[in-house]
Amino acid sequence: MKKSEIEDKKTLSSWYNYSGPEDDVILSSRIKLVRNLADFPFVVKASKMDKERICSIICDAFNQKEEYAYIKKSDISDFGRQILFDKNILPLDPKFDFSGLFLSSGENLYALLNNKEHLKLIAFASGFQPEYLMQEIYKLDEYLQSKLQFAASYEFGYLTSQLKDCGTGMKLSLRIFIPSTVIQNAFTDLIKYLKDRHFSIKSVFENSARNCIFDIFPETSFDGSELDQLAEMQALGTYILKTERKFRSKLADNNSTIVLDLVKKMYVMGMNALLLDYSEVEEILNAIKLGLQLGILSGIEESELNALYYTTKDGHLIYLIDNYSFSYEDDIKNSLSMQIQRLRAVVVQQAMGKIIFK
């Protein structure tokens, strides 16, 4: 297999292919808005007929939104579920219960039906864009409010089956890349800072040897208005940006040989491996991103590296394998898992081939 075989193959259209503000540290922003229809039981208590009626009512409301496509749960194949999992839309667990989902043409906003709540609206954007996401999702919410009656009260706000989601029903979250904070042993201080402000932090790649990508999110939606929550997330994101960049500067000054060794080792691995599993790609991308930020290398953009976290996942690679013809070495051409690892290595090498060390 040669790198030239995939140079003309377009990637699946999605939000993560675009650059965003401050995306050296804040890889992406996410917003979730939950709603329940008035006069219907929560999903956990709803009958099959209730769920069908809820689904029908919400689908009718979406009928005039041509930019959304509806996908029934029963119509999602194993491959389709893998694609949706790779895009952080659905888990792989077949027991994950829902009726269907609406997906926007840009794949940056989707609506999940009958999963714990009657309706979950979720949107993504590259970089640090919580305010933009809030504006986008509330445009859709305002439209739906004109078509649907949502369950709410003056005392508790929007009513949900999970008490922590009552109130605004909104949760903002950020995916952050903080290798310098971790390497400089300041991660524990960050956890305390977040906990004191009622935020949680979770590793994205739990099997990674060097965890440095995390999701941060509020513990509850109940405190404050939407604008209060937005202001808090903006302040938190700004703090993380300043903290990581401060430790990045210290890292460059005090650990230059160690960091250069790590970056070059991962570069050599990425450029010479014939087979790569996803955990190895995580390590390579983390190191190359750090090298780019420290000025060790050039020739590749933050947005390209951020997109590779998604486009090297199994679902995207299976899509390429199913839709294009590639030539494989004789000993792997009959093994899909080996073809995926081989193609993953080629995708990484195509992107990294432009890198220049300074």
What are these regions, as identified by a protein language model?
Residues 1-155, 162, 170, 184, ...:
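Long, Pro/Ser/Thr-rich low-complexity/intrinsically disordered regulatory tracts in eukaryotic proteins
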Residues 166:
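Active-site His/Glu-centered metal-binding helix of metallohydrolases
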Residues 172-178:
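Short glycine-/aliphatic-rich beta-strand segments at the starts of folded cytosolic domains
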